[in-house]
């Protein structure tokens, strides 16, 4: 039974609710990015990555530019423990990368964690325990003070073990299930942990606030972060971090608003992989910054290759509409969208525009390793003349007159509608070729000869009904003479309204494409001709146009 009354708000507002953060317009500098793909992302996979796959994933994250990478919960499995030992023993961690390990606030797990990182040059030890009202009551059956003591005991042991190692250990604490925790209570636990660790500006601790399960709208989360930010002890010695999940679909907004409210670090995954609806997608966050003209400090200039590698390693398919990453995020099928994109691209080329500002495309696909020819405009029954003309021009160099573009669009859409599918670039050209280049249902031109005289004279050799016939005509020029010959023989009346031609290449051997439009009783009929000789191409175009008029009549 669909019953909304069984639910109620589970979040807690901070004691002093402020919205100072809304005065900050946008993210102008990149936060510290921490990838949690190898642990938080991996635990959500139906088939977790094996050791070799995790090593490949680690290398991918390093190449993208992550400087903090969560590696493992080393007490959770032998694979996670071995991953750490492999990275450390084989010196696979770059000097500018800090790895992170995660541990519950339980003694045997903490000790196992330090065994796993023995010999590492530097690492973040991430301590957490759940603090929400529901978990205190239902899971732990402990009071607030008892749950806080769990965190403090864990913090004491972490500090003791860190002092016994030669590694440079940084501390991180997370009040897990923060969205269901009283905000002032979460702050109290964080400050109690910091009192034990006593961080300094030169050796900061991290306080990480997770939306373990998203309960509120993002502006509420931002106000909670603002309260933590303003009241956190040792503030100049603490990096405030957020770890958003996406249960309400607001993970990206939670992260962006959280940073505006005072957070300096974001934990998440590529493509938002994670439990339930996933972690926040760090690609979306980074590219949102990039699209506003700010450097996200992560490199996604070959995002399609990254996506394919990620899919191979995780056996998870990235949704085709995933922001920035999906296969179809730059694709326009709509006719009006295609027309605007086509004109925008043409304007950009003609005016040598430096800043990116093409309708319907927020970032240049080329920046992400995509291309205009196959990724931007694709044709189905919803498409229009602009998109089809754009495809013919960018792939084949054919520049159709505006009205012919419209007619060609109708022909292509008709084929797509009848087959109930998208048309490939090659299929679109085939439609053009069939309807406007090789269209000779009534007659074909076999040959023509021009003769000198007061006016231009021509003899055409046609093939009609399997018979070869010769016809003559005169005119003020070559095209006019051929047109008059066809008019007289077929008893036609039409006006030659449009004649355009363009080269299909830049060298001397390039072919030309001629387009001709003739009108009869207000209706246009089109033909195209392609040949190395422009006269030949023009004659071919006129012959097709007359054939189409004959069919119409």
From Swiss-Prot:
Subcellular location: Cytoplasm
Pathway: Amino-acid biosynthesis; L-leucine biosynthesis; L-leucine from 3-methyl-2-oxobutanoate: step 1/4
Pfam families with a match to the protein in the record: HMGL-like (PF00682), IPMS_D2 (PF22615), LeuA_dimer (PF08502)
Alphabetical list of CDD domains matching this protein: DRE_TIM_LeuA
Species this chain originates from: Bacillus pumilus (strain SAFR-032)
Alphabetized SUPFAM superfamilies for the sequence: 2-isopropylmalate synthase LeuA, allosteric (dimerisation) domain, Aldolase, post-HMGL domain-like
The protein's name in its UniProt record: 2-isopropylmalate synthase
Family of the protein in this entry: Belongs to the alpha-IPM synthase/homocitrate synthase family. LeuA type 2 subfamily.
Subunit structure: Homodimer.
Entry-linked InterPro entries: 2-isopropylmalate_synth_dimer, AIPM/Hcit_synth_CS, Aldolase_TIM, IPM_Synthase, LeuA-like_post-cat, LeuA_allosteric_dom_sf, LeuA_N_DRE-TIM, PYR_CT
Catalytic activity from the UniProt record: 3-methyl-2-oxobutanoate + acetyl-CoA + H2O = (2S)-2-isopropylmalate + CoA + H(+)
One Gene Ontology MF term: magnesium ion binding
Positions of the Pyruvate carboxyltransferase domain: 31-304
Stored HAMAP family: LeuA_type2
Task performed by this protein: Catalyzes the condensation of the acetyl group of acetyl-CoA with 3-methyl-2-oxobutanoate (2-ketoisovalerate) to form 3-carboxy-3-hydroxy-4-methylpentanoate (2-isopropylmalate).
EC number annotated for this UniProt entry: 2.3.3.13
Region (Regulatory domain): 439-553
Positions annotated to bind Mg(2+): 40, 243, 245, 279
Gene3D superfamilies, per the entry: 3.30.160.270, Aldolase class I
Keyword annotations: Amino-acid biosynthesis, Branched-chain amino acid biosynthesis, Cytoplasm, Leucine biosynthesis, Magnesium, Metal-binding, Transferase
Gene Ontology annotations of biological process type: L-leucine biosynthetic process
């Amino acid at each position: 039974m669909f019953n909304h009354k069984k639910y109620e708000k589970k979040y807690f507002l901070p004691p002093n609710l402020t919205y100072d953060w809304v005065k900050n317009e946008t993210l102008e500098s990149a936060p510290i990015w921490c990838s949690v793909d190898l642990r938080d992302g991996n635990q959500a996979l139906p088939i977790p990555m094996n050791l070799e796959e995790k090593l490949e994933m680690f290398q991918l994250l390093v190449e993208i530019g992550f400087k903090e990478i969560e590696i493992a919960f080393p007490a959770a499995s032998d694979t996670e423990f071995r991953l750490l030992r492999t990275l450390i023993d084989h010196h696979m961690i770059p000097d500018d990368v800090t790895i992170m390990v995660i541990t519950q606030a339980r003694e045997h797990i903490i000790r196992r964690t330090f065994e796993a990182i023995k010999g590492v040059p530097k690492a973040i030890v991430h301590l957490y325990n759940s603090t929400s009202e529901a978990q205190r009551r239902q899971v732990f059956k402990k009071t607030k003070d008892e749950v806080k003591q769990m965190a403090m005991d864990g913090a004491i042991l972490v500090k003791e073990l860190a002092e016994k190692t030669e590694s440079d250990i940084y501390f991180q604490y997370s009040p897990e299930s923060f969205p269901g925790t009283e905000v002032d209570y979460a702050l109290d636990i964080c400050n109690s942990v910091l009192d034990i660790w006593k961080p300094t500006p030169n050796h900061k601790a991290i306080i990480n606030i997770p939306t373990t399960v998203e309960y509120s709208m993002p502006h509420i989360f931002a106000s909670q972060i603002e309260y933590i930010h303003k009241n956190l002890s040792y503030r100049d010695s603490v990096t405030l971090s957020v770890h958003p999940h996406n249960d309400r679909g607001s993970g990206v907004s939670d992260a962006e608003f959280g940073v505006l409210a005072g957070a300096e670090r974001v934990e998440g995954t590529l493509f938002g992989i994670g439990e339930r609806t996933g972690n926040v997608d760090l690609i979306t966050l980074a590219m949102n910054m990039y699209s506003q003209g700010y450097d996200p400090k992560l490199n996604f200039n070959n995002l399609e290759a990254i996506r394919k590698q990620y899919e191979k390693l995780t056996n998870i398919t990235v949704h085709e509409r995933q922001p920035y990453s999906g296969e179809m995020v730059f694709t326009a099928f709509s006719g009006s969208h295609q027309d605007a994109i086509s004109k925008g691209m043409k304007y950009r080329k003609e005016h040598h525009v430096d800043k990116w500002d093409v309708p319907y495309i927020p970032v240049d696909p080329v920046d992400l390793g995509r291309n205009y020819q196959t990724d931007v405009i694709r044709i189905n029954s919803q498409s229009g003349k602009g998109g089809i003309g754009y495809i013919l021009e960018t792939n084949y160099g054919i520049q159709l007159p505006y009205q012919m573009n419209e007619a060609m669009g109708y022909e292509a859409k008709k084929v797509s509608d009848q087959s109930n599918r998208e048309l490939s670039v090659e299929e679109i050209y085939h439609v053009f070729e069939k309807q406007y280049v090789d269209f000779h249902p009534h007659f074909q031109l076999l040959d023509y000869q021009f003769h000198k005289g007061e006016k231009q004279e021509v003899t055409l050799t046609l093939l009609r009904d399997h018979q070869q016939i010769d016809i003559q005509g005169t005119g003020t020029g070559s095209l006019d003479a051929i047109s008059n010959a066809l008019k007289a023989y077929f008893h036609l009346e039409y006006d030659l309204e449009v004649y355009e031609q363009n080269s299909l290449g830049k060298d001397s051997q390039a072919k030309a494409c001629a387009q001709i439009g003739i009108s009869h009783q207000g209706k246009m009929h089109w033909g195209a001709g392609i040949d190395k000789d422009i006269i030949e191409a023009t004659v071919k175009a006129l012959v097709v146009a007359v054939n189409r008029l004959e069919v119409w009549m």
